[in-house]
């Protein structure tokens, strides 16, 4: 086998990409923040120029997130908690995918530009590798089932990116040499995803409520939306994207062995059953939004260990509505369609998205709370009170991450995969119908991205309450709004338990109050800006 040096590969890669048309490639500025040198300069259409502005916003948000919050020595975001760090890592991997996916290199390239892109990608990819070692895995192994499943989704996102980038990097050429170096991380990422998937799978319980995942092994049974959505999303993502794992540590048994395979039917089965259970659980409200979850009336564990199962049914509903509970299900819907070809999964997703958009008031942009936002912009209920917890600050970004995945066009490798998994392959008409529905969300997405952008401060950091522009002139109006809203009787925001205190409603920009700007709020902006980049690059 002929071995090629890295330099030879790059030269041949560049040669392959020498301009076919007279158009010049996007040039990459060495410093993405240098206003004198826009990131992309192109002779292409206005649409492309516009989407390159969106890409610039994505890169700026990512750079500020990593420079401000990521601690390279520790390999993690120092102020994050374990699950929000797992989500931050997912955003970084998904953003890399979005950047590379959206770049149209096919119209010709200049080698130095490509080398600079390579450097941008490698910089952040290396940081995800640092995080592999910085992630608090020993603690996470004993946390709630949803915590474990965020870990699964994060490392699958990393292997998805590596697979895509390795293919893209080769650009159709078959190099008789070692593949893209980043693939070295994938077996480790796959191993971690597999181990945490197995740890979480024991949360499935049929002794109560005829099924469903339990949220937390050490608390009274609570079957909530997020854990079930995560189990459905993680199961179908394992089925589709898990590249296999030959590392049997930390244990191997006959039951666990089944989970090591690629396209494992056990993963598909878990996805179908948890998706179905959740859909039929009665967890949605009249607006069609997922509420938080079910307790079992009367369930009790006596000190001697005896359990009184109470009614044994999911009959005590926590009616709080959060943005992230409308998001993760979308990845499950998309994956189940890809794995089965069944249109109903896509319809479920579009219905949920439509309900969310309606619950922001859109296209109405007045100041009245509509259930999940106001002014056409997504909000957490806690946003207006400036008391969102670290959990609450993470939610909107999760929604947009999964919305973007839901509407991400299929790559050629995914179409091939579907052809192998679904008899006859995917129905093109259904796929095009799906893309058309996705395209129709663009205005709402731009509206939300622009609202998030308006919260950006001089350091490039974003706030949590997207409806309040940075240094707003209308501060008195916002302050009155902040104390002006209450939850329906009997609903308690247990994820953001702080009461509005006068110390939160002090001075300064509203988005600096409460917990202020954090890696979590930054990741939320990153996600919505990336959605804008995807919609502009793909759908306009
Ligand atoms: C593109 O950008 C121009 C100038 O910023 C703006 O007027 C136009 O509406 C944008 N087009 C789209 C499709 O966003
Ligand atoms: C696992 O080992 C088998 C047999 O050696 C090999 O074919 C396969 O590619 C390996 N899978 C992974 C993910 O390394
Ligand atoms: C455990 O305690 C409960 C409540 O005191 C009692 O009803 C039950 O019989 C006890 N079970 C055992 C096995 O002792
Ligand atoms: C606050 O609530 C009162 C009573 O519902 C309403 O009249 C007022 O307009 C609200 N203020 C704002 C800023 O929304």
Predicted regions and their residues:
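Structural signature of alpha-solenoid helical repeat junctions
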Residues: 84-87, 140-143, 147-150, 185, ...
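Fungal secretory targeting signals
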Residues: 1-26
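Alpha-solenoid helical repeat scaffolds
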Residues: 97-105, 154, 161-168, 203, ...
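Extended glycan-interaction surfaces of carbohydrate-active proteins
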Residues: 59-67, 234, 283-316, 529
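Outer-membrane beta-barrel proteins
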Residues: 319-320
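CBM-like carbohydrate-recognition segments
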Residues: 26-131, 140-146, 182, 203-204, ...
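Fungal eukaryote-biased detector of long internal structured cores
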Residues: 138, 149, 153-281, 286-288, ...
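Alpha-helical scaffold segments in carbohydrate-active enzymes
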Residues: 94, 127, 150, 157, ...
């Amino acid at each position: 086998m002929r071995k090629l040096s890295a330099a030879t590969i790059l030269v041949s890669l560049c040669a392959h990409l020498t301009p076919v048309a007279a158009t010049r490639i996007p040039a990459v500025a060495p410093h993405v923040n240098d206003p004198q040198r826009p990131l992309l300069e192109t002779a292409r259409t206005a649409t492309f120029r516009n989407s390159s502005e969106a890409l610039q916003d994505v890169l700026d948000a990512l750079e500020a997130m990593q420079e401000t919050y990521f601690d390279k020595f520790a390999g993690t975001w120092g102020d994050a908690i374990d699950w929000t760090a797992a989500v931050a890592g997912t955003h970084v991997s998904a953003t890399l995918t979005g950047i590379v996916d959206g770049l149209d290199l096919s119209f010709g390239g200049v080698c130095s530009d490509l080398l600079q892109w390579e450097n941008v990608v490698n910089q952040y990819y290396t940081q995800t590798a640092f995080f592999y070692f910085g992630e608090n895995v020993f603690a996470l192994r004993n946390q709630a089932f949803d915590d474990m499943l965020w870990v699964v989704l994060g490392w699958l996102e990393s292997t998805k990116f590596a697979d895509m980038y390795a293919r893209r990097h080769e650009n159709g050429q078959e190099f008789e040499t070692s593949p893209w170096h980043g693939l070295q991380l994938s077996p480790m990422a796959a191993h971690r995803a597999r181990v945490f998937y197995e740890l979480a799978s024991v949360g499935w319980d049929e002794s109560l409520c005829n099924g469903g995942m339990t949220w937390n092994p050490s608390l009274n049974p609570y079957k909530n939306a997020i854990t079930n959505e995560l189990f459905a999303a993680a199961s179908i993502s394992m089925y589709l994207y898990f590249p296999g794992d030959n590392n049997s540590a930390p244990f191997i048994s006959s039951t666990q062995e089944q989970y090591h395979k690629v396209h494992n039917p056990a993963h598909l089965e878990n996805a179908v059953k948890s998706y179905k259970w959740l859909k039929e659980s009665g967890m949605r409200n009249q607006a069609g939004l997922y509420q938080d979850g079910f307790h079992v009336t009367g369930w009790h564990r006596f000190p001697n260990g005896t359990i009184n199962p109470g009614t044994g049914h999911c009959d005590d509903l926590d009616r709080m509505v959060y943005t992230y509970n409308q998001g993760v299900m979308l990845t499950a819907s998309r994956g189940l369609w890809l794995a089965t070809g069944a249109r109903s999964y896509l319809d479920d997703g579009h219905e949920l998205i439509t309900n969310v958009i309606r619950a922001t008031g859109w296209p109405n942009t007045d100041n009245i709370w509509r259930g999940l936002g106001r002014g056409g912009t997504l909000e957490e209920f806690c946003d207006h009170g400036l008391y969102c917890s670290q959990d609450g600050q993470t939610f909107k970004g999760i929604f947009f991450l999964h919305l973007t995945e839901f509407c991400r066009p299929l790559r050629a490798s995914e179409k091939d995969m579907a052809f192998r998994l679904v008899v006859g392959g995917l129905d093109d008409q259904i796929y095009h119908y799906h893309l058309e529905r996705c395209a129709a969300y663009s205005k709402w997405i731009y509206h939300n991205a622009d609202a998030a952008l308006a919260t950006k401060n001089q350091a490039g950091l974003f706030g949590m309450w997207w409806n309040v522009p940075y240094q707003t002139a209308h501060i008195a109006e916002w302050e009155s709004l902040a104390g002006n809203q209450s939850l329906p009787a009997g609903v308690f925001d247990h994820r953001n338990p702080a009461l509005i205190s006068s110390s939160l409603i002090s001075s300064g920009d509203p988005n600096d109050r409460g917990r202020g700007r954090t890696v979590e709020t930054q990741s939320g902006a990153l996600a919505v800006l990336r959605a804008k980049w995807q919609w502009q690059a793909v759908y306009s």
